[in-house]
């Protein structure tokens, strides 16, 4: 026994080699404390049969569960929230609120029994009322906080508690299931880690915090339990956290193959006295999870190993490159907390929410899970808002890859390229849609497995191509169902706008906070009246012909595919989605065929990790780009379409991108009225030479050392030419920059000159401008040195001997009527493409 422990210790020491270890004042060792691990996921590893770090990995590989006990647990959380805020809260209102929040889960839960659920839920409510009354005879109810979050960089932990008070005197973790004795070890570990966070973040001792476990299945006398501190178990939990971090960093450094052989069920059995229980109940479930990993071909195993390694490398690379100054946008998860000094996540009770609306004046945050805020929170006057980090996207990618591994061999072989896609040439269009689109629409319809549609800037990929694809599918097969998805909330909003305009019936998945208010009535949670019937909602979901969602929502809530079959899935923005995040969805047996719409010549998905491992280079590609290359290498053209008619850029603006980036595609104007104009509609008299240049040239490069001043000067001049009556901040002018700090510099210069009329114009980075357009674009390159030039021109690739600069392509193709560029000419000319650009458009 001693020998075995000694060997384990040696193995652990080897695992920790090269990692940063922080030693706290009490001697507690924390490996890589900057890596934050969720408390609940650590606690979930503590089972009767052991607590092995591989259990953490296996839990990340398991498909998302959707069971009646989980639904009941979520309901209990909703009930606790409502009872805290209103002691007389109505049971029916609680049921409706929970149903609204989890409509998709209720509809797709296979073991759901409405009668039993209602009985169990009522018992939970009665017990919660008793517990709340008991707790708040001693504590101040107005100080109650529901689901406050914490980040502890001393321990490398993050998490959220079900209930506590703002004075930190009370901490309660709620469980809706069975106790199995006094309480489960996993639940004990969870509250011990929460207490550890309070101790190390706020220097609280055990006597100052009342820690309780609330088992709301039981009356208060049996279910509300005091929890005493157990330092030995707490340290064991931190040790497991260290092993988890070390294991995942090992995968990132040495590859998934370094642990793959250890992913066997018996590894998790550490307590032999529990072997009967383990082999009877636990082992079969683990085998079902892991079986696909061990039944892949050599090629598929190599693919999986590379992709999983890439995902873990990306997880840690994002940690190193995360920036709290990163610009927030609608749909982002954030922490917000009371500002009472310098911002510091670790020394505040955090609230978690989603950005609902954001502009220069205001940020509206939707509290997590529609929680009600307590009086103690609402009376605060000033808040700090910071991005909320999460491993959810990494876990979603892992589960997506596992879904691919468990897919049918035919689907796997198709996506791996060992099986050629099929075509049914007997298919014909139901009607003619548009001469520029009919050939592509026909070939897309004839594609039996997949079709790739390249949509360069301004070619109407959503407003025209996607609309026609939807109309053709439903007119030819009225009983068919479509799944439409995209990477960003904005793209999903654009899809919804197209469907509204074309009069289609559809549902949108996701939260109200992330949805444009124009389409909130299409959310599943809005699709029923005040007293919904599960059968009605399920029928609505089953019958609706179109479902729209972001790809991340489909990854994290894959339950839809268990009840609804789709003849066609169309993925917009497909060139911005890394392969692991989409391959599981597209290999599902619930989807017959798919169409990917994208443009590999625009900016791809952001990858944080360096491109220093040749084996992982292909992992940086989207599935769209990989399949596009695959089709070209196979010499097949029938499964690829290119939209060539663009209605955005005036031909003078399109000339340079056409020559340098779209040599094969050769984009042509539609032409729209503004594309036929011979001159710019600037009628005010020129006051100097620069005014005259701006009036005469559609594309113009202006050298500048102080770019912010020049940009604001040009903005003033263009505003005068456009005129107050015609100026529209959302359409007239936009400013594109390379770095975020340029935004602040330009805004400060505008404020200094008192240009309030220009406050509403969009000033943003190239990455954020992708998908947008303005009549006039001003592009401030912001390059001051060779490193900056390298950064500016880093997103390039070679195609047919030509260099395609994706970032420059996106910047140039946002403008409809005029494009103004500025920057350090001498430095920019050291790049071949910029050198030609400057020579061609300088005066």
Positions of PLM-derived features:
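Conserved helix-turn-beta segment of the N-terminal RecA-like "Helicase ATP-binding" lobe
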Residues: 490-522, 749-755
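Pre-ATPase regulatory/linker segments immediately N-terminal to the P-loop/RecA-like helicase/translocase core
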Residues: 54, 214-220, 228-246, 325-442, ...
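Metal-dependent nuclease catalytic cores in nucleic-acid-processing enzymes
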Residues: 182-214, 332-336, 340, 584-588, ...
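Conserved helicase motor core of SF1/SF2 NTP-dependent helicases
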Residues: 479-480, 486-490, 538, 552-555, ...
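Accessory interdomain/linker segments of ATP-dependent helicases and helicase-like nucleic-acid enzymes
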Residues: 1, 249-348, 696, 710-711, ...
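Metal-dependent nuclease catalytic cores that hydrolyze phosphodiester bonds in DNA/RNA
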Residues: 1-166
């Amino acid at each position: 026994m001693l020998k075995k422990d000694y060997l384990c210790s040696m193995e652990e020491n080897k695992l920790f080699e090269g990692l940063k270890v922080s030693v706290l004042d009490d001697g507690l060792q924390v490996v890589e404390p900057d890596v934050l691990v969720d408390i609940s996921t650590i606690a979930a590893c503590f089972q009767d049969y052991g607590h092995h770090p591989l259990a953490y990995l296996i839990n990340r590989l398991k498909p998302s569960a959707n069971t009646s006990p989980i639904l009941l647990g979520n309901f209990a959380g909703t009930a606790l929230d409502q009872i805290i805020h209103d002691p007389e809260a109505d049971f029916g209102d609680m049921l409706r609120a929970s149903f609204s929040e989890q409509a998709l889960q209720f509809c797709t839960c296979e073991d759901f029994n409405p009668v039993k659920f209602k009985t169990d839920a009522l018992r939970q409510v009665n017990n919660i009322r008793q517990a709340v009354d008991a707790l708040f005879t001693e504590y101040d109810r107005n100080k109650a906080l529901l689901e406050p979050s914490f980040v502890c960089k001393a321990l490398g932990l993050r998490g959220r508690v079900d209930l506590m008070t703002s004075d930190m005197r009370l901490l309660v973790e709620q469980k809706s299931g069975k106790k199995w004795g006094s309480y489960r070890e996993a639940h004990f570990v969870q509250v011990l880690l929460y207490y550890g966070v309070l101790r190390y973040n706020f220097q609280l001792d055990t006597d100052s915090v009342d820690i309780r476990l609330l088992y709301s299945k039981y009356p208060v006398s049996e279910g509300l339990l005091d929890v005493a501190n157990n330092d030995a178990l707490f340290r064991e939990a931190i040790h497991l956290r260290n092993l988890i971090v070390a294991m995942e960093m090992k995968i990132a450094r040495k590859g998934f193959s370094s642990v793959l052989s250890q992913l066997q069920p018996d590894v998790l059995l550490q307590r032999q006295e529990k072997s009967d229980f383990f082999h009877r109940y636990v082992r079969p479930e683990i085998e079902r999870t892991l079986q696909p990993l061990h039944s892949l071909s050599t090629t598929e195993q190599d693919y999986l190993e590379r992709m999983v390694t890439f995902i873990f490398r990306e997880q840690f690379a994002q940690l190193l490159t995360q920036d709290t100054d990163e610009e927030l946008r609608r749909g982002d998860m954030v922490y917000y907390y009371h500002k009472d000094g310098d911002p510091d996540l670790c020394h505040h009770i955090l609230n978690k929410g989603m950005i609902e609306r954001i502009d220069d004046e205001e940020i509206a945050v939707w509290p997590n899970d529609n929680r009600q805020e307590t009086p103690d929170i609402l009376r605060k006057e000033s808040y700090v808002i910071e991005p909320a980090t999460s491993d959810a996207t990494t876990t979603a990618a892992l589960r997506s890859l596992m879904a691919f591994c468990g897919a049918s061999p035919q689907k796997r072989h198709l996506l791996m390229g060992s099986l050629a896609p099929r075509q049914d040439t007997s298919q014909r269009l139901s009607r003619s849609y548009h001469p520029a689109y009919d050939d592509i629409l026909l070939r897309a319809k004839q594609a039996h497995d997949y079709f790739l549609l390249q949509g360069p800037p301004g070619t109407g990929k959503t407003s025209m191509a996607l609309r026609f694809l939807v109309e053709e599918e439903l007119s030819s097969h009225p009983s068919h169902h479509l799944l439409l998805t995209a990477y960003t909330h904005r793209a999903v909003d654009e899809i919804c706008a197209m469907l509204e305009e074309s009069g289609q019936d559809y549902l949108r998945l996701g939260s109200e906070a992330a949805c444009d208010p124009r389409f909130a009535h299409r959310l599943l949670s809005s699709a029923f009246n005040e007293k919904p019937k599960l059968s009605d909602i399920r029928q609505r979901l089953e019958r609706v012909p179109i479902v729209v969602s972001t790809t991340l929502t489909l990854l994290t809530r894959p339950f839809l595919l268990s009840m609804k079959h789709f003849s066609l899935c169309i993925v917009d923005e497909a060139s911005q989605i890394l392969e692991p995040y989409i391959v599981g969805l597209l290999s599902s047996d619930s989807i017959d065929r798919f169409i990917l719409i994208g443009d590999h010549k625009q900016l791809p998905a952001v990858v944080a990790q360096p491109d220093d491992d040749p084996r992982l280079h292909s992992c940086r590609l989207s599935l769209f780009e990989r399949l596009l290359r695959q089709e070209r290498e196979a010499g097949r053209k029938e499964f690829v379409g290119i939209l060539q008619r663009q209605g955005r850029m005036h031909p003078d603006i399109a000339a340079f991108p056409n020559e340098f980036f779209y040599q094969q595609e050769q984009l042509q104007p539609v032409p729209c009225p503004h594309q036929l104009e011979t001159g710019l509609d600037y009628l005010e008299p020129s006051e100097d030479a620069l005014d005259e240049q701006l009036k005469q040239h559609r594309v113009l490069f202006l050298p500048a050392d102080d770019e912010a001043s020049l940009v604001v000067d040009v903005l003033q001049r263009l505003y005068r030419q456009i005129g107050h009556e015609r100026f529209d901040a959302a359409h007239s002018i936009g400013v594109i920059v390379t770095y975020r700090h340029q935004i602040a510099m330009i805004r400060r210069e505008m404020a200094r000159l008192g240009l309030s009329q220009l406050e509403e114009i969009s000033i943003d980075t190239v990455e954020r401008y992708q998908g947008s357009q303005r009549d006039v674009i001003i592009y401030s390159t912001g390059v001051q040195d060779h490193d900056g030039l390298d950064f500016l021109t880093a997103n390039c690739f070679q195609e047919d001997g030509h260099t395609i600069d994706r970032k420059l392509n996106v910047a140039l193709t946002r403008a409809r009527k005029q494009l103004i560029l500025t920057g350090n000419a001498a430095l920019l000319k050291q790049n071949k493409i910029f050198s030609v650009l400057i020579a061609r458009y300088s005066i």
